[in-house]
Amino acid sequence: MPLYTVSTGRSLSVPNRKALANLIMDVHCVITGAPKTFVNVMYCDNIPLEDGLQMNVLGAVRKGRTAEMNATLQNTLIDKITEMFNMSDLQLDLSLFEVPAQWVMEGGEILPEPGEEDQCEWLQKGHNA
């Protein structure tokens, strides 16, 4: 958790996929404090997108963060992705939807709610995915 699904009309090159995954991971972790091993990015190629769009990014994120944090996350991702691919914000559709933490497992363990990470014994011992 989170899972970001990146859909494009054409396949991205492997270097662009790696760079985009690292960008998404870095932005998500800096803003939310999530461990890097929690961030997942999946690519879907040759997807018909709405006219004018080059990319669609759908992020499933843990429910319970503030609306302000989610807005900062969304806006920062939009700014950085459009800069990386030299596109306007009208060519990128990026949205986040919240998923309850108890619906998700990482390494066979149920995720803690946002803000309760310090009470999570398995996470404090170190999470290695």
Task: Annotate each language-model stretch with its function.
Residues 1-129:
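Interaction-mediating elements
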